[in-house]
């Protein structure tokens, strides 16, 4: 008997017992949600009415299964307890986040707690226990890419289409674009009557020629759902350049496909579709293709995708100009720097030309979104530049307000803050659009 206990103790580490206990406990907590009303979870009375016997039963079953896995010959050398901790932590946080959202809506405090919880699990299993991804077959990356694309397309296209049929659109913008595409199909141009309550070209509000890329498909299938599907296709197509960029940096096929999966799960892209079709749905794919072309030093694709990005919206020139500036200041070949200078200059010229068109023939460039930075007698661009150089503290005080801080955590926090950590200072230039377009404006939809 003593020999048995000696061998048993030698085969397992104390940390593995703890991981197994936590994994079984978390799995049990999620499973008993099926036997309790969801509305009672975040309530002090839940503990008094919890199904204790079921909790104990599920815990015993899960702990037993995890223990059995340790004695299966093929799994003996695998860190099954580490994997179980990661999986159970993920499913627990997702399940309780869904319950929290249904019961109380978005809660940044709960989100931060979830991030800390997941970080500890990842640090212990990946950092301390050195768990590694299992060996995949050579073609497994194709399945990961396909599943990621299907998931993203279903969420951004199918879910939004079903919401349209339920008449659950959140604002009247979808009516604007449906009418606009119908008029474009009939040869009347991007004309609407509901955007400002009189006949008006949408390009007098936002200059977005890229909409004509969607027109052939709408002409073939003239229905509002077509627009929802096209939105999903454009957003989902960004999976491909993400995969190619990862491959350019030397990641394996499976790791590159996992980057694409992260893209598919990133809420800033999928959640952005919840306001129905807007021109911004084309930005992620065009920008990622532009970055891929820059990384591969492909001249024609770089110029093509820079042009496509510019046609999305007047302020899309900011993204192109910043990428050009980044290429100029980063450690690149002379050819790439020259191309960076070209697209930077072209983006600036295009931006000022479109602004002049909107100010003279349209409704203006909506400079009121930056009214907090415009001093008396100052123009928009001048005011922003002068304020940035003479009073940066004022800008910082406006950037880190409650809702904007929440938005920053939601967008950068889910990426582990990686965009904020780099040894190459030129990369921080790429944060300019995030600050200028999302955080600085007073328009609330820029940080939602």
Predicted segments — roles?
Residues 1-26, 60-156, 339-343:
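Start-transfer (signal-anchor) and selected internal transmembrane alpha helices
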Residues 62-71, 225-250, 289:
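Transmembrane-helix motifs of polytopic, lipid-linked glycan transferases
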Residues 63-72, 394-398, 405-435:
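Hydrophobic, aromatic-rich transmembrane alpha-helices
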Residues 79-80, 236-265, 284-285, 301:
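Transmembrane-helix signature of polytopic, membrane-embedded enzymes
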Residues 105-110, 230-236, 261-294, 308-319:
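Multi-pass, polyprenyl lipid-linked donor-dependent membrane glycosyltransferases
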Residues 158, 176-201, 209-210:
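Extracytosolic helix-loop segments that constitute the early lumenal/periplasmic catalytic or substrate-binding loops
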Residues 249-250, 282, 288-302, 328-334:
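Membrane-interface transmembrane helices that cradle and orient dolichyl/undecaprenyl
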Residues 319-348:
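Perimembrane helix-loop-helix junctions
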């Amino acid at each position: 008997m003593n020999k048995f206990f000696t061998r048993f103790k030698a085969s397992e580490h104390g940390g593995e017992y703890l991981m197994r206990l936590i994994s079984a406990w978390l799995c049990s907590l999620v499973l008993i949600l099926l036997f309790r009303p969801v509305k009672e979870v975040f309530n002090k009375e839940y503990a008094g009415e919890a199904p204790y016997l079921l909790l104990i039963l599920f815990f015993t079953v899960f702990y037993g299964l995890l223990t059995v896995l340790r004695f299966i010959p093929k799994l003996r050398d695998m860190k099954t307890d580490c994997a179980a901790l990661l999986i159970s932590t993920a499913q627990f946080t997702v399940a309780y986040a869904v319950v929290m959202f249904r019961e109380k809506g978005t809660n940044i405090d709960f989100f931060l707690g979830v991030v800390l919880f997941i970080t500890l699990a990842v640090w212990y299993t990946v950092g301390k226990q050195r768990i590694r991804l299992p060996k995949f077959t050579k073609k497994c990356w194709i399945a990961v890419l396909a599943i990621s694309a299907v998931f993203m397309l279903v969420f951004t296209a199918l879910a939004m289409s079903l919401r349209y049929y339920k008449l659950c659109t959140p604002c009247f913008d979808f009516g604007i674009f449906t009418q606009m595409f119908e008029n474009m199909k009939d040869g009347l141009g991007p004309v609407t009557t509901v955007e400002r309550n009189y006949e008006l070209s949408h390009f007098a509000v936002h200059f977005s020629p890229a909409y004509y890329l969607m027109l052939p498909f709408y002409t073939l299938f003239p229905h509002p759902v077509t627009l929802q599907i096209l939105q999903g296709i454009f957003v989902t197509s960004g999976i491909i350049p993400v995969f190619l960029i990862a491959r350019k940096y030397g990641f394996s096929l499976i790791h590159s496909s996992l980057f694409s999966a992260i893209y598919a799960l990133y809420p800033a892209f999928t959640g952005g579709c919840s306001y129905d079709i807007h021109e911004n749905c084309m930005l992620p794919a065009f920008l990622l293709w532009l970055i891929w072309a820059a990384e591969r030093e492909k001249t024609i694709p770089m110029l093509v995708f820079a042009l496509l990005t510019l046609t999305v919206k007047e302020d899309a020139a900011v993204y192109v100009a910043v990428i050009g500036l980044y290429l100029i200041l980063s450690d690149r070949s002379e050819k790439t720097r020259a191309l960076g200078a070209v697209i930077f200059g072209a983006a600036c010229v295009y931006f000022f030309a479109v602004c002049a068109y909107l100010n003279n023939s349209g409704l203006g460039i909506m400079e009121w979104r930056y009214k907090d930075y415009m001093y008396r007698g100052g123009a928009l661009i001048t005011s922003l530049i002068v304020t940035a150089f003479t009073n940066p503290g004022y800008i910082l005080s406006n950037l880190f307000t409650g809702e904007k801080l929440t938005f920053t955590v939601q967008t950068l926090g889910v990426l582990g803050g990686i965009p904020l950590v780099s040894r190459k200072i030129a990369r921080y230039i790429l944060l300019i659009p995030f600050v200028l377009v999302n955080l600085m404006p007073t328009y609330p939809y820029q940080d939602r």
